[in-house]
Amino acid sequence: MSASKEESLSPDEMRQKLYQTFKSRGLLDTLKTQLRNQLIQELQAPVRRGESASRRSADHTDSVLVSACNSVVVDHLRSAGYEYTLSVFQPECGLSKDKVLSSRDVLQIMKISPHMPLYKSLVSNIQSGQSGFLKSLLMELTDHSVYRDCSDNSTQTTSIAAHKESLVEKMQLIDEEYEVLRHRGDRWASVEAKLAEYRKEIQEQAQIELNAKLQHFMDVEIAKVKQEEKERSRKEILELRRDMEKTYELKSEALISREKNAIERLQKHQEIEEKDIYAQRQAVLREIESVRSREMELRQRMEAFDKSCALHEEKVKTMEDLLRRRELSVKTMEDSFEQKLKSELLKYQLELKEENMKRPEKLTENEERIRAEAARLQKEAAVVDAKTEDYERKSSEVKQLLMELESSRSQASLLKQQKELLREQLENMRDYPELKKHTLELQTRISLLKQQLEEKQQHNQRLTQELSAPSHEHLMLQAELRRLEAEHKLEKEELETQKNVLHTQLQHEVQQCALLKTQLMECEERTKWMNTHTEELKLQLQQTQQGPALRGPKSRTVAPEHDSDMVISALSRIRELEQEAERLEEAYRSHQQRALSAEDPTLHRGSQNYSRATAAQQHRVISRSPIFAGRPIEEEHEEFSRTPSPAERLASPPARRLSSTPQSASRSKRRADEEHDEHSLNPECVKGSSNTDRPALMFPERLISPIPAEELSSSISPNSPVMKSTTRHTQSPAKLQEILLSSSSQESSPQPEKITLHDLTEPIQMVSADQPCLLKDCEPELQQDHPDVQISSSSSSSSSSQREEEQQRETHTLQQQPHEEQTQEQRDDAGGHVTSAASPTGGAEEANPLQRYMQMLMQDKQQEQSPNKESSGSHEENLQSESHEHSAGVISHDEADDDFW
């Protein structure tokens, strides 16, 4: 109702809509023009307007010049688009569309010959549609008046004034002719108007007379037709009355004779029927007693059937209780099994590290197993489908039998109704033959119903026996069906998740391949650059070998050895780069293997599930294992936060970082700003480096970042599981522990671990020697990743227990946070003291972590060279003497070391 009310419009809205539609279609404009035309025609009537109006209309219609002017105005209004004024002007001036003169006719009236240039220009403008006739005429006239004084001296030309005077004279002549014609037309205008009025009056009188004659003729004819019809109907009614009276008399005589015969027959029949009715009453009473006894038997059988159904329901309930108990026992077994798994996983960690090299073989075996299991599952699905079809067929048969039971009940109710009808018929029994026939029909029906009842009772008994005692095979099939359906659903879900994960992994692998290719190209470029740099160093060697004669006897023994050390370090750096390229290829292959092993589907039960879970766990353990545990965290941070300069690559010890590790764009920008500030604040260092005898080779234009900033920002996201497990030391240990816990809680979800692009390019976590407690706290969480994936899909109770365990671990980590923070502060203080003692520059450079890192590297280098120093004391003295001479060069090398990594 509300919708109909909303759809219905008010009368005002309806008027507005009609007005808008008429306006858009142009009906309003046409109506307005018609009304204006009628008003103007009425106002122009000669009787109302008098002689002056008749003169004006005659002048307008008869004068050629006025019609030409009107047609020019009409053409101008039409070309300018003034339709409203045009609709008013046309009826007012008395011009119809047919009487409007064309532009050529107007030019002919103006006596402009077609050979004149004015005629040609006007016609061309009108045909091109640039402007109307009046506008083009005015333009030509203005152009003519503007250029009238122009004349060519080389040719004999006449002025345009004579032509203009001739035009004026022509217009005056036309006006005079127009006046003469107007005076002539005034005589006949009033006569024509009167003749038109007389014609109208005569036509109206003739029309009135014609209508009166037609009306009189129609009245006379209608009266005649009515009288004829009345006479015909009266004659027909009389004939029908006579026929009806004759037939009525004949029928009444026949009915009287029939009534007499019928009364006699009825008396005889009543005597016979009374005897038959008495005998039938006795028989019906006997049948009623037999029907009652059968009803009692049917009721007893129905009660027995209901009792058997109730017993069957109780059995089903007991079976459900048993199944619930079994489920509870299974859950308890699963919990105990989980605990065993947790204990066994701790033992298997060491074995899994050894099995890491055998992963490709295991992967191929797993693929073959998956294929075999897929074929087996397809076969089992076909068997299950066949069993389900059998089950549906049997259930349909049971439904049909139940329908037949209901139909038998409905037939029993129908029998009751028939019995009541029989009672009523016994009470109101009058017609003997009909009753006899009805009784015979009832007897036949009763016999048929008895047979049907007996058959259905036997059938029902057989069905109840079958239903009450279900077969053991049927129960086993139902249980297997449920189990197989659950397994099939799980397998489908796992296959879908595996497909999605493999698809995403494929995309990530493609992107990683592209990144690794670019990084390999960069490594090749670096090797080329190193080759060129070695050549430059050789040239520098030659120069330094030529220079000792100028420096004196002290530097002769030291400079060649120092230069040879630099060449050896450069060659070692080239070898390291080649090894790094090989490591890159190995890392890419191992990552492919890890990605495949991490995404294995958990389709199998028993030992196969454990093997897959441990394989994925092995990946996580290796990615989180404390490789390079002996290195400090500051060194690792500075190593991964900046790109190496060429001079640092020569002077630094062997690098421990893969070139595939990404460099953060924000860190690189920050580092560049810091270097710019340092160079601006310390110009003395730059001067010192430029004044040294041996120039420090620095190539800032050749610094190559491993990954561009755009690709890095797209590839690195903080939400990946590997990113969470391999965070830098810039965060506090408590934050690191929280991130590890969050990653373990995310990995314990039933969804498999997804590998993103930055996971492939992420460096391995460098864990210091004093952080084993963090890894020990995180290990049980990492061990539970894949078992939780398998168990969470089977039961929801295990997930709740896992959440409780995770909460306990979080509380444990929160308790350990203060202790870890204290140890971290102490370690930072110790590192600060070491760097302050070893730094050669002022206090401004001590706060710089890069300077600290370089000093630590120098200390390591000195420790490595300490046995050589003990053996050669004289060599050490020479180095000390040379260090005073080349202090500015050392400072320049230290500045170059800031750009290392």
Swiss-Prot record:
Biased composition (Low complexity): 735-754, 792-801
Gene Ontology BP terms: cell projection organization; convergent extension; convergent extension involved in gastrulation; determination of heart left/right asymmetry; epithelial cilium movement involved in determination of left/right asymmetry
Annotated keywords: Cell projection, Cilium, Cilium biogenesis/degradation, Coiled coil, Cytoplasm, Cytoskeleton, Nucleus, Phosphoprotein, Ubl conjugation
Biased segments, Basic and acidic residues type: 671-681, 776-788, 802-831, 872-887
A Pfam match: LisH_2
Post-translational modification: Phosphorylated. Phosphorylation at Ser-659, by the cAMP-dependent protein kinase PKA, triggers ubiquitination and proteasomal degradation of OFD1. Also increases its interaction with TBC1D31 and regulates its function in ciliogenesis.
Residue positions, PTM Phosphoserine: S659
Region (Disordered): 541-563, 585-697, 709-901
Every LisH domain range: 65-97
Localization: Cytoplasm, Cytoskeleton, Microtubule organizing center, Centrosome, Centriole; Cytoplasm, Cytoskeleton, Microtubule organizing center, Centrosome, Centriolar satellite; Cytoplasm, Cytoskeleton, Cilium basal body; Nucleus
Reported phenotype of the disruption mutant: Embryos display several alterations during development including perturbed intravesicular fluid flow in Kuppfer's vesicle, convergent extension defects and randomization of laterality of organs.
Cellular component GO terms, alphabetical: centriolar satellite; centriole; centrosome; ciliary basal body; cytoplasm; extracellular region; nucleus
Coiled coil: 164-512, 564-600
Record's keyword annotation contains Cytoplasm: yes
PANTHER family: OFD1 CENTRIOLE AND CENTRIOLAR SATELLITE PROTEIN, ORAL-FACIAL-DIGITAL SYNDROME 1 PROTEIN HOMOLOG
Function in brief: Component of the centrioles controlling mother and daughter centrioles length. Involved in the biogenesis of the cilium, a centriole-associated function. The cilium is a cell surface projection found in many vertebrate cells required to transduce signals important for development and tissue homeostasis. Plays an important role in development by regulating Wnt signaling and the specification of the left-right axis.
Assembly and oligomerization: Homooligomer. Interacts with TBC1D31; regulates OFD1 activity in cilium assembly.
Family according to the record: Belongs to the OFD1 family.
The protein's name in its UniProt record: Centriole and centriolar satellite protein ofd1
Native source species: Danio rerio
Gene designation: ofd1
